[in-house]
Swiss-Prot record:
Self-association state and partner proteins as the record states: Homodimerization via its hinge domain. Binds to DNA via its C-terminal region. Interacts, and probably forms a ternary complex, with MukE and MukF via its C-terminal region. The complex formation is stimulated by calcium or magnesium. Interacts with tubulin-related protein FtsZ.
Region (Flexible hinge): 666-783
Membrane spanning stretches: none
Organism: Escherichia coli (strain ATCC 8739 / DSM 1576 / NBRC 3972 / NCIMB 8545 / WDCM 00012 / Crooks)
Gene, per the UniProt record: mukB
Keywords, alphabetical: ATP-binding, Cell cycle, Cell division, Chromosome partition, Coiled coil, Cytoplasm, DNA condensation, DNA-binding, Nucleotide-binding
Pfam families from the UniProt entry: MukB, MukB_hinge, SbcC_Walker_B
Main location: cytoplasm
Compartment(s): Cytoplasm, Nucleoid
Function: Plays a central role in chromosome condensation, segregation and cell cycle progression. Functions as a homodimer, which is essential for chromosome partition. Involved in negative DNA supercoiling in vivo, and by this means organize and compact chromosomes. May achieve or facilitate chromosome segregation by condensation DNA from both sides of a centrally located replisome during cell division.
Family stated for the protein in its record: Belongs to the SMC family. MukB subfamily.
Segments forming a coiled coil: 326-418, 444-480, 509-603, 835-923, 977-1115, 1209-1266
Record protein name field: Chromosome partition protein MukB
Keyword Cell cycle carried by entry: yes
GO-annotated cellular components: cytoplasm; nucleoid
Amino acid sequence: MIERGKFRSLTLINWNGFFARTFDLDELVTTLSGGNGAGKSTTMAAFVTALIPDLTLLHFRNTTEAGATSGSRDKGLHGKLKAGVCYSMLDTINSRHQRVVVGVRLQQVAGRDRKVDIKPFAIQGLPMSVQPTQLVTETLNERQARVLPLNELKDKLEAMEGVQFKQFNSITDYHSLMFDLGIIARRLRSASDRSKFYRLIEASLYGGISSAITRSLRDYLLPENSGVRKAFQDMEAALRENRMTLEAIRVTQSDRDLFKHLISEATNYVAADYMRHANERRVHLDKALEFRRELHTSRQQLAAEQYKHVDMARELAEHNGAEGDLEADYQAASDHLNLVQTALRQQEKIERYEADLDELQIRLEEQNEVVAEAIERQEENEARAEAAELEVDELKSQLADYQQALDVQQTRAIQYNQAIAALNRAKELCHLPDLTADSAAEWLETFQAKELEATEKMLSLEQKMSMAQTAHSQFEQAYQLVVAINGPLARNEAWDVARELLREGVDQRHLAEQVQPLRMRLSELEQRLREQQEAERLLADFCKRQGKNFDIDELEALHQELEARIASLSDSVSNAREERMALRQEQEQLQSRIQSLMQRAPVWLAAQNSLNQLSEQCGEEFTSSQDVTEYLQQLLEREREAIVERDEVGARKNAVDEEIERLSQPGGSEDQRLNALAERFGGVLLSEIYDDVSLEDAPYFSALYGPSRHAIVVPDLSQVTEHLEGLTDCPEDLYLIEGDPQSFDDSVFSVDELEKAVVVKIADRQWRYSRFPEVPLFGRAARESRIESLHAEREVLSERFATLSFDVQKTQRLHQAFSRFIGSHLAVAFESDPEAEIRQLNSRRVELERALSNHENDNQQQRIQFEQAKEGVTALNRILPRLNLLADDSLADRVDEIRERLDEAQEAARFVQQFGNQLAKLEPIVSVLQSDPEQFEQLKEDYAYSQQMQRDARQQAFALTEVVQRRAHFSYSDSAEMLSGNSDLNEKLRERLEQAEAERTRAREALRGHAAQLSQYNQVLASLKSSYDTKKELLNDLQRELQDIGVRADSGAEERARIRRDELHAQLSNNRSRRNQLEKALTFCEAEMDNLTRKLRKLERDYFEMREQVVTAKAGWCAVMRMVKDNGVERRLHRRELAYLSADDLRSMSDKALGALRLAVADNEHLRDVLRMSEDPKRPERKIQFFVAVYQHLRERIRQDIIRTDDPVEAIEQMEIELSRLTEELTSREQKLAISSRSVANIIRKTIQREQNRIRMLNQGLQNVSFGQVNSVRLNVNVRETHAMLLDVLSEQHEQHQDLFNSNRLTFSEALAKLYQRLNPQIDMGQRTPQTIGEELLDYRNYLEMEVEVNRGSDGWLRAESGALSTGEAIGTGMSILVMVVQSWEDESRRLRGKDISPCRLLFLDEAARLDARSIATLFELCERLQMQLIIAAPENISPEKGTTYKLVRKVFQNTEHVHVVGLRGFAPQLPETLPGTDEAPSQAS
């Protein structure tokens, strides 16, 4: 790391109070402590004087008059010195460890002005052991010493080996050495720089915030960018000279420029208007045709909308009519649903009562069963009693009739007897006395038939009897059931009525079972009926939409026809879509192709124009790009040859000019350095001595001296030797000849003259042979002769160079034209004519548009037919599945029939529901009604008679059967005597008879007991019947109410009613939705019709206006075309590339040209009047008259002797060839010299940014600096608003102010000043000239505003002003500012001095007692951080803990005052962490 230079000591010699005193300076802080008048300010004044020995600046205010602004005459310095020689010297050591002593010799000048003479000097190479006081003093004895004057000091130092002493005649040189050696931070080139440095030191010395520094911080902190200013000045000077030359050329070209300007602007003015009118005429025709097409299309759209409006209005009326019916149906459905719900609630009540009745019925049946069981037991008891009676009777009969069979013989006898008995019994029983065994078989069949009949009758009566016996108690119950079902009737009718009721019950039950199927069937038929009605509605709607009535049989065929039509239309639509896509694609391709051709057409036309011009210029016809490139190669070869020849001529011309310039030098010196060397050596050039030699002798003397003819003749070569040492600025070979210039001759050489040559014997062993030069240059006469011949040659060369330059320029212009043509137009120049292709494509586009329009119309009709067919098919798809319904004419009748059957079934169901239980109970006991208990005795008698009859018939049949069976027994007559009775059997029968009689007695007693219990059961049964009848009556009332409601309340009735209501609601909602849609569509259609009507009216108006305009403009356009053709200017005016520009662009082009023409013809009365007349937009032919007038005017002014053409354009091109070369050369030179405004802005802005960054880095070093309430110090750098706006305009909006920077009358500085005034008109520039203002604006420092801010207490950041700070705070803040300035100077100067030098850094502070201890500590810390030396002068309040402290006490001894000095090194303990760069020495006394 480079060490920073340091001030080692300050030496005061013969100052007031200090005879010879050296103050060793601390590396950081040196404190001068002492009371008032102790010499602290004198010490600092000596330091400042040695640092800045400028009497115009030195002004020590604390020793001058109080309140004075100018101070005393000596400005405080004269009184600080003693009489005689005084010195102030600074001993320093720089970063290179070089010891340098700088100082001043001061001496009071006698006189009333109290002046002081100052001489600065410097000493280098002084050994470290030599003290400064030893140099400038001489010890006379132990108590006396003498101060050496400056010349003795110089001699003393020169006597010392390695020591260099330099005395300076100017302060600038003194400061330059100090800067180079790293003693001061900035190079002080001028008095202004010294003033700034002194103001810095002065501000440091007296403390506080220096207004002189704060007001001009820019000058202190920002380096001057003089290189930029110098570059601008050189640029402006060169530009000024160049512009003067260009102005001269422009004056020469005035006629040509005027002609060219007039022709170009007149052509632009008239051609733009001509082509605009042509374009407008075409546009108006296209618009008229377009208006007509749109008018036709709008009329068709309006008619279509009107038809659509009528259809939608009709449909809306239909929906409005249907909405009322649907609302009524919906209300009826809602009412029906409410009735169904009421009926269902009634039905629920009925079901509850029926449940109660069922429960009572069950209890009644149970009680009936109990009664029946009791009756059965009663009947059993009766049967048992009767059986006992019968058994008794039978036993009695058996006892009477029974015979006992014996053994086999007895059995035969018995059988015989039995057969006889059987025959007798048969005769008796059958009442057939004539009956025999043989005839018994025939009578058997007869009596068997009787038996069968009697058995059947008996069985019937037995059944009746049995039933009567078992159901005697149920007859009343059955009778009551029949009465309940049928009503009152006679008891004898009960059986027949019951059977009829049972048969009717079966039928009713069968019908009741059909209720659900009938209901489902009815629902199905009703659904089909609704579908039939919907189908009829759809069919009616379909017929209405088709506009024709169709039979049902025709619908399928129509459906197939529509399907076929849809298929064909779909194919047609699909094909039409593809065809339309193909047409549109072709149209888009055509449009794209036309657009690309229209974009290419201007390029192609420009290429054709360029190609025609090239053909006219070179006289060649080009048919392909190969021809152009081949001709360009030939042109390049010609150009190369011409350039080579021109360069050779130019090089020869330059060589001639250089030779003329060299020969024109005074004294014949070809090298200016020889003149300087001759003056330095005190000699004379040899060519000056022989300047008067004649032209004839010139070849001889030139050959005689040979290479030494440019030698210098000096009186004494020995005196030149010391000058030759270290000589570098001289020719490679420098000849010196000793001799007297006043009497010099050629005797110095031994010469032998030969034929046109000489032999010079330079030495015994060295000769030189030189021939006479063909063109001698030795002597003024020879040089003048040579110059004359060179001038003649130069004239020839100049003329040849001009001719060649003209040819090269012409060739280059032609080459440039070819190059431009190749670069810009070659690719398209030989392509086909885009305009012809555009015309073909436009005709094809028109055909496509017409075909597309026809196709759209056809496609629209097909689409309408397709939609209609689709709607028809959709409707038929809904109708065809219902054709069978439509064809079913009996559906309504079947519905009525099923409804009637359902009513019957429901009646039967209600009958079954009402009487089903009674019938079910009646059916098992209906038989009891066959016999009335009141006829039971008769029935018994009938049964007994029938039984007897059956028994008799059986006996008769049995008897006959027995006879028939015993027919063989009649032969056993012999065994009859053997039959006998059996007395034992009779005894057993009697015993059984007694037992049977006892059993009969017991059965009769049981019968009487059970009869009483049966009576109790009958009473319970009667109560249950009463409750049942009451419930039954209530149930009948509810059923009658349900019948009065008139609604079938089955399980699905509510769901069907709700579905019906929801269907009607959905239909009503759909109808309303469709009605709303139709109303909206109708409103939109009406609005669309209104819009179309308004559009139609506007189109009609626009069409008729456009048509009238086209017709009106046609007459004027015909007059214009006739005038153009008559005057032959169509080629100039009909610029086809302008046909592709818009009307606004052409009008703008014409207006711009008109403005330029007004200025161009302002001095020509005739053209001015014609131009004014041509401005009438209603008379376009007058513009043609103006163009013809301009051409005529230019033809009259063409010099036919120079330019042999009748065309002004060709004349201008020929005039331009010669002058353009000079203009291009000077313009290119100007462009090389000129600098753009954007570059200036960038340079200034970059410089500002660099300096702002530098200031920001400086601010970082002061962030932790605090004094009193001041917590931090910073420097704000802002760009002035007015200057920032200037930079923005220069960089971004410079095109708007090119009138200033492109002006030939203004330099760049003046243009910059004018721009500043234009941007800031409110600023008063005073008496300063624009050049001065512009030069100030080129200095970036004038763009910046700088101010110092402090962070003080609770106030935050505020501007640093002395009035806002305490004294100590102002001192600390001012010191911070000064440190920042010093750092800035070092950064600025780093690039100017050596990289290995870091300059000394030292500041002062007088009267430091105004700072508190904390601020003093802050200063110490600042010095440590910045490696800065600080000299503080203060009273006794400074504690010598750090740095070096000198105690100064002024004493008087024997009328002589001197200052007693005691120095102390800091004795404070070293901190644990020291700041970088600090190195405190141990405490010691000095």
